[in-house]
Structure formats: C-alpha cells, structure tokens
Swiss-Prot record:
The lineage of its organism: Eukaryota, Viridiplantae, Streptophyta, Embryophyta, Tracheophyta. It holds the Pfam family Tubulin. The modification N6-acetyllysine is found at K40. Its main location: cytoplasm. This is Tubulin alpha chain. Dimer of alpha and beta chains. A typical microtubule is a hollow water-filled tube with an outer diameter of 25 nm and an inner diameter of 15 nM. Alpha-beta heterodimers associate head-to-tail to form protofilaments running lengthwise along the microtubule wall with the beta-tubulin subunit facing the microtubule plus end conferring a structural polarity. Microtubules usually have 13 protofilaments but different protofilament numbers can be found in some organisms and specialized cells. It comes from the Eukaryota. It catalyses: GTP + H2O = GDP + phosphate + H(+). The keyword 4Fe-4S does not apply. The active site is at E254. InterPro entries: Alpha_tubulin, Tub_FtsZ_C, Tubulin, Tubulin/FtsZ-like_C, Tubulin/FtsZ_2-layer-sand-dom, Tubulin/FtsZ_GTPase_sf, Tubulin_C, Tubulin_CS. CDD domains: alpha_tubulin. It comes from Prunus dulcis (Almond). PROSITE patterns: TUBULIN.
Amino acid sequence: MRECISIHIGQAGIQVGNACWELYCLEHGIQPDGQMPGDKTVGGGDDAFNTFFSETGAGKHVPRAVFVDLEPTVIDEVRTGTYRQLFHPEQLISGKEDAANNFARGHYTIGKEIVDLCLDRIRKLADNCTGLQGFLVFNAVGGGTGSGLGSLLLERLSVDYGKKSKLGFTVYPSPQVSTSVVEPYNSVLSTHSLLEHTDVAVLLDNEAIYDICRRSLDIERPTYTNLNRLVSQVISSLTASLRFDGALNVDVTEFQTNLVPYPRIHFMLSSYAPVISAEKAYHEQLSVAEITNSAFEPSSMMAKCDPRHGKYMACCLMYRGDVVPKDVNAAVATIKTKRTIQFVDWCPTGFKCGINYQPPTVVPGGDLAKVQRAVCMISNSTSVAEVFSRIDHKFDLMYAKRAFVHWYVGEGMEEGEFSEAREDLAALEKDYEEVGAESAEGEDDEGDDY
C-alpha cells in the first residue's frame, strides 16, 4: 500500500483538516462513526482508500492523521464535533498554552515540549503502514503554532523519515487581509525551514479564496468554513488518485518529479474549476476545454499573484469525473497556443495530467454545485515570487526598526536567525528571477553570480 499520513498543525491546519476529512468520508461513504457500509472486506483489505484510512478489526475506518495545536479550543471542537468518533483520542494532541502568534514560542519554548509526543503518535501511525509514501502537512505560516511548531515538526520528520516525501499545504498571509501584526516575521522564519524540509509546498491565501467565493459562488461574506471547503476540494483532487483507481494515476512522489525543476523552487500555485454555485450550474454545460481554461484564469489562483507576470515551469492537471484522455489532450493543446500562458523556454512540454473517474463529491448544504467533471491544477510558476517579495518587504519595514523583535529574543531566539532567514528568502527571490530569465542570455553572466 502507498499510505499517506496527514499532519494538521495549528488552527488553520486543523480547520482545513476538518473540511478535508469530512469530504473524504463523503467520497468513500464512511459514516461519522467510521463505519463503512459499502466496504465488503471487513477488518483489512487492500482497497485504494486504505492509503488514507486504516481499518480496525471491527471494521471501523480511522484516518491516518494527527491534529496538533498548542492550545485546546480548536481541537476541542473536533473532540465534540460531528466526527468525534472518527478519530482515536490519541490522534488529537493539544497543549495548554498558546503560541501567542510567536514563532519562537511555537518553535522553541512551548513547541519543544509537545513535539516528542507528536512524533511518537506519528511513529505509531507509520508503523501501522506497509509502505508509507509520505506526509501531507497542513499549516499556516502567519500564526505562532503553524509557523513555529510546523517548522519544528518538519525538521524532525526530515531526521526521522529522511527519504519520505513531504507535501505542504500552507496558508500564506494575504496582501490586504492580515490576522496578526507579526505575520511577516513568522512567515519569513517559517519559510526558511519550508525551503529545506518540504518537497512540494502548495501556497494558499485567504484573500484569493475569499475573492473566488465572492465572485464565483455569490457568497457576500464568506466564512472560514466556505474557504476551507473550497480548499478541501483541491486537496481531495490531488489525493484522489491515491484513494481511487483511475485511468491516469498520479502519485505523491510524481508531483515532486514533475513539478520541481530545482529543489528550492518548489512553491506551487493551485486552482480549481468549476467553482460554481448550484443556481448557475443548472444552466451551464462545462466541457473539459472550458474547465481547463478557467483553471488557468489568474482569478482562479488560490494565492494572490498573477501568473501572467511570470512564466510557467510545469503544470499538473488532475481531472476527475467524466473525462477522457482525448479531450484532455485537445484542451492542453489549446492552452499551449495561448499567448497569455507562457512557459519557460527550457521546459517545452510542461504538462502532467491525471484522470480519475470518480466524479467530484460535494458536501450536502455546501456552496459548490454537483458537477460531472472538475479539474484541479497545481502549477509551478515564477510569479509565486510575488508572494515572497510582498512578505519580505513588510518584514524589512518592521525589522529595520527591530519592532517586536524582543518577544522573539525573549523566547530564546537570536537576532541572527532573523537575518539568516531573510537572506535565505532574498536568495529564493533571486532564484526565481534566474529561472524565469531566457536561457540564451543566462550563459554569459553565469560566472558573476557564484
């Protein structure tokens, strides 16, 4: 089996996790108490969904997941929520004291007390797997727990499970909407370790997803539940090929191979189509070509950056539902002829496609319409650098005055770590610049940079 373990860290990670597991359960027909009436092989079996769920002797399906937070309120919602019977109580780990939006607390003082417990739980899950494929890590980098404890866990996972791939779904601070003053610090410090310790990171941004909800779903005031349900569709599409049998299956390690040209350039944009409300879907027939085009629209990107300002290095298109390879090839051929969608000149093919025959499932009472086919795109584009330069600029403004730095130093960090992380990100921006440059020009001035 090719199992995946999901690790949900901090409030954002846990709430996205709730939406994902709710959706997985609906997709597989697993009830909130873990029973699965449709499963013929009780107590084991090699069904495709066993990559995400382990099965007890009594036929109960338990998610291969760990939820961690440094304070109890968010995890208590899981403990008392609809799906409380789904999880083993040991999978829900909460501390007593918050990271207080402080990377250093999450990474050093408070985080290090809980990290060994988390690793024990993860080890138990890993021992339960026959062929662990990798980890899916969900967190946000603006707060304290997601950034600090998230980085710490990733560093420790690299030590304990060196070769296993780690896929991150990371919520980055938005350009306008901010939830905390020290977001830029936490993000820069956290990205520093994401660079080292994740193999692929999919960037999400609340503002971009708000706009999609407002524009495409006509929700005037989107809540986090609306956002998370949209994000969970993306994550479900990515993992569908692990959980169902399809025509063109895509493995987690395959994402890595196809999307990451250089180890540091592994930050991806994601988009999903069709995002459409039930009232509209009734009147529209969405062909493969249409949903493919709409996945490439700058407004469908789930992070605030404009792919028209950069070049694509690689794209992964995951279709699900009533889709045949012939239509996909035609749609991709059309995309390649478009002038607005530019690829770097050293990567002529640039597309990886996956097809899964399981049509997209929607949460009853949710916002998305039930459709016959959908596509999720994960793309590696040089325009992602916009996200980093935005955060770096805000970081510089604050750090020039050393504002708020004493909170971090007081928790055992050194100022050197700030400048080290900032330099690493400056190098990352430069890497993106060089990757997007025309390769013919690049040959004369190679010598100066190194």
